[in-house]
Amino acid sequence: MKIVIQRVKEASVSIDGKIAGAIDQGLLLLVGIGPDDQAEDIDYAVRKISHMRIFSDPEGKMNRSIQDIEGSVLSISQFTLYADTKKGNRPAFTGAAKPDRASQLYNSFNAQLEQLVPVQRGVFGADMQVSLINDGPVTIILDTKYR
């Protein structure tokens, strides 16, 4: 799994002009599923994201987690994180998991994360418009293959 984690003041996702999900302070996650991803990758990602201390404490140090601040998550499926740009000018996305498998793992990831923090989500495979106000900005890339 490749996940772009962005600390946000607020974020929302719209489909066909209608808001499908929105959060106030929390994390915007762009979630890509690879062909070799398994339940262990989900476990690792959920544990890391829910405990990652990237929110400021009263002294201004990044010392608090999404759980500590009682924030929310907006989760967006993002197969383009597996783009291969080696040849030509048009990215290839053959490195991403097949849609059926990716959808299953993405839904499992969200369900597991939702046991720890409130989760809003986009619609898998839909054309979405994402709006956000970055906080910091703080942007972290988590790749479950490098643990």
Swiss-Prot record:
PANTHER family (alphabetical): D-AMINOACYL-TRNA DEACYLASE 1, D-TYROSYL-TRNA TYR DEACYLASE
This protein's major location comes to cytoplasm
Q: Which organism is it from?
A: Streptococcus equi subsp. equi (strain 4047)
Q: Which compartment or compartments is the protein found in? A: Cytoplasm
One Pfam family, please name it.
Answer: Tyr_Deacylase
Signal peptide range equals none
List the molecular function annotations (GO) for this entry: D-tyrosyl-tRNA(Tyr) deacylase activity; Gly-tRNA(Ala) deacylase activity; Ser(Gly)-tRNA(Ala) hydrolase activity; tRNA binding
Record keywords: Cytoplasm, Hydrolase, RNA-binding, tRNA-binding
Give the enzyme's EC designation. 3.1.1.96
Domain comment as written in the entry: A Gly-cisPro motif from one monomer fits into the active site of the other monomer to allow specific chiral rejection of L-amino acids.
Give the family from UniProt: Belongs to the DTD family.
| Listed SUPFAM superfamilies | DTD-like
- Residue ranges of the motif Gly-cisPro motif, important for rejection of L-amino acids: 136-137
Has keyword Hydrolase? yes
InterPro entries in the record, alphabetically?
Daa-tRNA_deacyls_DTD, DTD-like_sf
Q: Which GO terms describe its biological process?
A: D-amino acid catabolic process
Name this protein carries in UniProt? D-aminoacyl-tRNA deacylase
Cystine pairings recorded for this chain = none
| Presence of the UniProt keyword Cytoplasm in the record | yes
Any GO CC annotation of this UniProt entry: cytoplasm
